A protein has these predicted regions:
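N-terminal glycine/threonine-rich, aromatic-flanked beta-hairpin/loop signature
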Residues: 39-70, 110-118
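Contiguous, well-ordered beta-strand patches that form the walls/edges
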Residues: 58-99
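Short, low-complexity, Pro/Ser/Thr/Gly-rich segments in the mature regions of secreted, periplasmic
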Residues: 123-136
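Sec-dependent N-terminal signal peptides
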Residues: 2-13
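Short, exposed beta-strand-loop hairpins at the edges of beta-sheets
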Residues: 101-105, 109-125
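N-terminal helix-cap/turn-to-beta initiation motif at the start of protein domains
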Residues: 14-23, 134-136
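Short, solvent-exposed loop/hinge segments that bridge or flank secondary-structure elements
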Residues: 20-56, 80, 90-104
Length: 136
């Protein structure tokens, strides 16, 4: 019986210790009708520490910061059983921050990306990347 209790505690505590790596494929929406085709973004999350980063497609990165790359770190990441939400600074000019937000359903895998000051958004579906199972 003691072994069962230990096993249960060990397994339940490891649920949130794993990193979650996601590949999200979808489309970019824009006020001006323009078809970019299917795009992808990658999320790397540490569920235990509630930290992570997002790798945006170039079409979602403003020209003024493209030379810094397309990887952004979450400042605010909230994780529940049903949903993951997060925000990060896309650009910062003086005291003005352009903050982007993601909402990810842990049930359906659907992701929504929005930015308050930019008119582009992203909507798609995410699948888990098994980093320990390499394709090549």
């Amino acid at each position: 019986m003691k072994k069962l209790v230990f096993l249960f505690i060990f397994l339940s505590s490891n649920v949130y210790l794993d990193n979650l790596n996601l590949l999200c494929k979808g489309t970019i929406g824009w006020v001006i009708e323009q078809d970019f085709g299917e795009m992808s973004m990658t999320l790397n999350l540490n569920l235990a520490e509630k930290t992570g980063d997002i790798l945006l497609p170039p079409q979602l990165v403003p020209y003024m910061v493209r030379d810094k790359g397309n990887k952004f770190f979450f400042e605010d990441l909230k994780i529940t059983d049903d949903e993951i939400t997060g925000s990060f600074v896309l650009t910062k000019t003086g005291v003005i921050k352009s903050i982007s937000n993601i909402t990810l359903s842990r049930i359906t895998g659907q992701i929504n990306y929005t930015n308050r000051y930019r008119q582009k958004g992203f909507q798609g579906n995410c699948t888990k990347i098994e980093v320990d199972k390499k394709k090549f």
